[in-house]
Amino acid sequence: MSRDLVTIPRDVWNDMQGYIDSLERENDSLKNQLMEADEYVAELEEKLNGTS
């Protein structure tokens, strides 16, 4: 089985890595926002259940 190799210029590789890093940071940020929203919803549910 032979494998085809592709040469990628260093600047293209670095750009791609930078893009991947930025997507990972954005993903982490969205995960944090989701966790905060979950906590907020849990607090609201507690308040709702406490008053009913």
UniProtKB/Swiss-Prot annotation:
Source superkingdom: Viruses
Protein name: Gene 5.9 protein
Record lineage: Viruses, Duplodnaviria, Heunggongvirae, Uroviricota, Caudoviricetes
